[in-house]
């Protein structure tokens, strides 16, 4: 079971989602579903409006419908708390597709982290999308130069039900900051951005694709956005205690950067229910995911590559449809 500290950190919504997941784990829920369980009416879980998942989910929903010939196919992008919520709702049949961080998906299938004691057995990997960097966002006028400077500050750490929340706590902990050392705002960057602008938040820790349009919007409004680096022994601690990889945000990512910013990253990936999405439809979804990526309007489309489609799969089973597509592409042994 989750510790009381973890439960408080997750909030009621995420805890309720995990309780529902527990009901979906165990014998009979893994593997593929029967034909009567498959559907072409798909709900795609995304994230908050301030991140990349939401617009990407909207655009992919349109691409799926426009490029896949399947009777009755309808795909609707749904705003959610992101990774944890998306995987939990796939487990209980409320979503059929979802975008999530690869490290959160590993936890889901292994019953670890946010999913302690609640293994998800009906989620299949459709493929890696793009890297997501941890971005510790503040304003130049804040005087914040290091994560350690966030002691006593008001920090947005992401909404309950998202992988950002757990990542933010890991980052803060590596710098010696635990619950009570800062005031936590449980919201996504869409809301946190406004609070940074009006002075009701000192910083926001986000896991976002680079470049993040919402961060560029904040710079356009304030003219003083600053990214706080993760480096030194603290960076080593974060990497050693998580599935994050060292990453460097290039200086040309944002106009306000003068030099690269060291940080960590995970991978955003698309997942599908193995109970409700058939092999045939899963194949078409995976094919569209990569062969229509150039049709996206988001900058992250440049990072979506079929050659790297299986990166970050880890312990998550391939969806049968994705396996078929990847075999055709020569990606599997």
Model-identified regions with their sequence ranges:
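Bacterial signal peptide processing site
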Residues: 25-28
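C-terminal motif of bacterial Sec signal peptides marking the signal peptidase cleavage site
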Residues: 20-23
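Bacterial N-terminal signal peptides that target proteins for export
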Residues: 1-13
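A bilobed periplasmic-binding-protein/Venus flytrap-type ligand-binding module shared by bacterial periplasmic
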Residues: 131-144, 242, 266-280
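An extracytoplasmic/periplasmic, membrane-proximal ligand-sensing/linker region
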Residues: 187, 191, 208-229, 234-240, ...
